[in-house]
Amino acid sequence: MEIPSQEIHIMIDNTISRRKERKTNLADAEPIVLMSVLSSLHAGYFRISLSLCSQALLWKIMVHLHSELPSMAYYLLWYLALATQVSLCFLYAFKCIFLFDMVKEEFSHYIGVNYLYAPSISCLLLLQSAPMIEPHSVLYQTLFWIFAVPVLTLDTKLYGQWFTTEKRFLSIMANPASQVSVIANLVAARGAAEMGWKECALCLFSLGMVHYLVIFVTLYQRLPGGNNFPTTLRPVFFLFFAAPATASLAWNSICGNFDTIAKMLFFLSLFIFISLVCRPNLLKKSIKRFNVAWWAYSFPITFLALNSVQYAQEVKDHVASVLMFIFSSMSVLIFISVMLLTAANSKRLLRRDHVLWSSTGPKDK
């Protein structure tokens, strides 16, 4: 008589080990996510804080001139700009530590190198719009030098390359983003003038304006560098009127009044703005898909609005008041629109920008 064999299956509950494995996977995933964010981040993201800081400066001036405007909006905007700037600075500092090779690659890129000025510009604007620091205080002066020294250092490196390095002539490397370096010097000049350092302000202003004229003439000739500018970055064309608008602001602070030179620079920026607005096809392809470059629409308009405010204060007629109202309203509306679009497209915000990492210069393609 045969006894039927029976198989006994023993099931071991390994939920504890699975939980440990899941925790380990999450712990391993967190550094991967951070490194992914850092690898996607570049200095062009400081366009966001640049827009916030310039908007805070506009609101500071407007609240001072028109007491009926809510001062709470200015304070909230300034603290939002501060939080954004600090966050971006920390992230970019981590990138410099962990992904320094990518930072060097960005420094070598004919477009990316210009946005290395953006953190300093944002900090200088944040300082000038600060509600609690007086321009003549020691803290203001100390922070000014901390933010201005990187600008002068980059000037020495970048401008020197244009006439000493064999493969990096301005005629080859020039592109609309090259005007960011000019804006950095002019914003620093305004900051120095606010402290009463007239000689320092004139030095920075002359440095910025000389290079602006050279860059503007180079770009006006449509040399090879401009033809290599990517379509997705065409919002950066708004820098064409941002540079003379910033120069007008700086000269107004140096002289203490909106004189003839300041008016000429304002009219130049106004003319270039109208010229760009009359050519919507130039920007049509760049707005098909969201890109962080869209923030380049915001801060140039804000600089133009700041100019219109100063112009209205000097001229005091109906046309000047209408210009101030139009550009101030336009600045706020564009700023809010871009901010809402950024929130709606947050998943696309930190995608790797293949434009900036595709080549180191026009001749490298």
UniProtKB/Swiss-Prot annotation:
Biological process, per Gene Ontology: intracellular monoatomic ion homeostasis
Keyword hit for Ion transport: yes
This protein's record includes keyword Transmembrane helix: yes
Keywords per UniProt: Cell membrane, Ion transport, Membrane, Transmembrane, Transmembrane helix, Transport
Ranges facing Cytoplasmic side: 1-25, 95-106, 153-168, 221-235, 279-291, 343-365
Transmembrane segments: 26-46, 74-94, 107-127, 132-152, 169-189, 200-220, 236-256, 258-278, 292-312, 322-342
InterPro entries membership: SLAC/SLAH (IPR030183), SLAC1/Mae1/Ssu1/TehA (IPR004695), Voltage-dep_anion_channel_sf (IPR038665)
One cellular component term from this protein's GO annotations in UniProt: plasma membrane
Membrane topology per record: Multi-pass membrane protein
Chief localization: membrane
Extracellular topological domain: 47-73, 128-131, 190-199, 257, 313-321
Subcellular location: Cell membrane
GO MF, one example: voltage-gated monoatomic anion channel activity
Subunit architecture: Homotrimer.
Function noted in UniProt: Slow, weak voltage-dependent S-type anion efflux channel involved in maintenance of anion homeostasis.
Entry-linked PANTHER family: S-TYPE ANION CHANNEL SLAH3 (PTHR31269), S-TYPE ANION CHANNEL SLAH4 (PTHR31269:SF59)
Family statement: Belongs to the SLAC1 S-type anion channel family.
Protein name as annotated: S-type anion channel SLAH4
Species assigned in the record: Arabidopsis thaliana (Mouse-ear cress)
